[in-house]
Amino acid sequence: MIKWPWNNSQPQVQTLEHWQAAISIPLLAPLSDEEHQKLAALADQFLKQKRLIPLQELLLTDIMQRRIALLFSLPVLSLGIGALDGFHEVLVYPGPFIVEEEWQDDIGLVHTGKMVQSGQSWDQGPIVLNWQEVQDSFDLSGFNLIIHEVAHKLDIRSSGEATGVPLIPLRDIAVWEQHLHSAMDALQEEIDLVGEDAASMDPYAVHDPAECFAVLSEYFFSAPELLEERFPDLYRCFQKFYRQDPLARLKSWQNNINYRAPSIY
């Protein structure tokens, strides 16, 4: 039973009911009652501080907004809402969207063209999502679009650009980079051996260090057992940075209740 830190007036009871429904997704099931309370409080702050802007006639219902806010708040559960101060707006498409992009090839030529994107995190601007893949982020599968984009914002806070190294003590940077690059090398070797489709983790992680940090942050929160098994040293680095231990949380939850995945309404 979740106990909520609100008084018993009618508007607050209504709010309580909304948060209970929004929290009922598999990703958040392992959190303790205390963590649910803290997460809901952070999500409430998030909704007061950020603008959620639906695009292409998407209707963002109350529970959709609350679930978006909860997923944004999960990676900063111990860091605090101030860690998300690098943006003010979240744009939400119904599904993957097309953008004009520039890229440089191996010989230095710059190309432009249209590309399909799932999400974007602009260095000095909003986060862009698509609701279809936000819904795919509700389970414990290793995929989480919002956590991926939040990781980019946390990365950018460190130096003003995404490098794969978030805001950590200087003494920890060398070890962080060593373990991150080691994970990239191991994943690249696996991809070379079995191909991208058969790889055990998302091959996008080998794109560059920033994407590796973002992709593996998804696993840290939604498939911690896999990340810890494959890259235990990097798991501990993430644990120290995020100040959370999702694997211990998951094991405790599995050991203390009869597992039944929450229904998504």
Swiss-Prot record:
Binds 1 zinc ion per subunit. This is Mlc titration factor A. One of its GO terms (cellular component) is cytosol. Involved in the modulation of the activity of the glucose-phosphotransferase system (glucose-PTS). Interacts with the transcriptional repressor Mlc, preventing its interaction with DNA and leading to the modulation of expression of genes regulated by Mlc, including ptsG, which encodes the PTS system glucose-specific EIICB component. Zn(2+) binds at residues 111, 148, 152, 211. Its main location: cytoplasm. GO terms for biological process: proteolysis. Belongs to the MtfA family. It is an enzyme of class 3 (hydrolase). Its cofactor is Zn(2+). Interacts with Mlc. It comes from Pectobacterium atrosepticum (strain SCRI 1043 / ATCC BAA-672) (Erwinia carotovora subsp. atroseptica). Its EC number is 3.4.11.-. One of its GO terms (molecular function) is metallopeptidase activity. The gene is mtfA.
